[in-house]
C-alpha cells in the first residue's frame, strides 16, 4: 500500500495521546481510594508542606493509601483494556496478509489495548483477574485454566481447554510477520495440556489433550 509509512507515523502520533487518555481515565479509582483512606484518618495533604513535622504514622498511612490506590488503578486499567480489546478485536480469517495494508493497521490497533494492560497485567497473573482480562479480550478459556503469563497475544484467536496450564513468561502468538506478510491463524490448546515456562507457541498450532510443551521450547506455526 503506497504511503503506508506516512499513515503509520500519523496513527502513531494519534495513538500516544490516546494511551495517555485511557491511563488517566482508569486512575479515577486509585485517586478516590487514596483520598478516601487518608480522609478516614484525618490526614491533610497540606500538612506535608512542613514535612519534618508530620508524624511517622501519617507517613505510614499515606504510603498504604498510595499502594492501595496504585493497585486499584492497575486493576481498573487491566479490566478496561480487556473490554476495549474485546470490542475492537479484528475478525480476520486465517491466512497471509500484506504487511503494508489496512489489515495490519486493524490488527495493530487491537494490540494497543494489550500493551496498555501490560502496565499491570504481569502482577495479576496467575489470578482470576488475569483470566478475566483474557476472556474480555476474546479468549476462550475452559474451566480451571491457569495462566501465568502476560503474553497471550491475539487473545481473540486463542482457545484453551479445561485444566490447561500456561507457564511463566510463555508466549502464545496467533500472528507472525515474515517476508512482508502478516500471518494470522488461531491457536488451540487441548484439555489438561501444559505449556512450559518461557516457551513460544506460534500461529496455527494445535496442542493435543494432555500434551506437555517443554520449557523454552518453540512450537513452529501450523504444527
Give the predicted meaning of each segment:
Residues 1-135:
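Terminal amphipathic alpha-helical/low-complexity segments used for targeting or macromolecular assembly
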Amino acid at each position: 500500500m503506497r504511503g503506508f509509512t506516512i499513515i503509520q507515523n500519523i496513527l502513531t502520533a494519534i495513538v500516544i495521546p490516546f494511551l495517555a487518555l485511557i491511563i488517566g481515565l482508569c486512575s479515577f479509582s486509585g485517586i478516590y481510594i487514596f483520598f478516601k483512606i487518608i480522609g478516614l484518618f484525618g490526614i491533610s495533604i497540606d500538612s506535608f508542606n512542613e514535612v519534618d513535622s508530620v508524624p511517622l504514622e501519617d507517613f505510614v498511612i499515606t504510603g498504604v493509601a498510595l499502594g492501595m490506590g496504585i493497585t486499584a488503578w492497575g486493576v481498573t486499567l487491566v479490566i478496561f483494556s480487556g473490554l476495549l480489546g474485546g470490542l475492537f478485536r479484528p475478525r480476520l480469517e486465517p491466512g497471509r496478509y500484506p504487511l503494508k495494508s489496512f489489515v495490519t493497521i486493524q490488527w495493530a490497533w487491537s494490540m494497543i489495548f494489550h500493551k496498555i494492560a501490560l502496565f499491570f497485567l504481569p502482577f495479576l497473573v496467575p489470578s482470576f483477574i488475569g483470566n478475566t482480562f483474557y476472556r474480555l479480550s476474546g479468549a476462550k478459556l475452559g474451566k480451571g485454566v491457569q495462566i501465568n503469563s502476560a503474553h497471550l497475544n491475539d487473545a481473540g484467536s486463542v482457545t484453551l481447554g479445561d485444566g490447561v496450564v500456561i507457564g511463566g513468561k510463555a508466549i502464545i502468538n496467533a500472528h507472525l510477520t515474515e517476508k512482508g506478510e502478516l500471518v494470522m491463524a488461531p491457536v488451540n490448546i487441548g484439555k489438561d495440556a501444559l505449556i512450559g515456562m518461557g516457551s513460544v507457541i506460534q500461529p496455527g498450532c494445535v496442542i493435543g489433550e494432555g500434551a506437555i510443551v517443554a520449557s523454552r521450547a518453540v512450537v513452529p506455526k501450523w504444527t
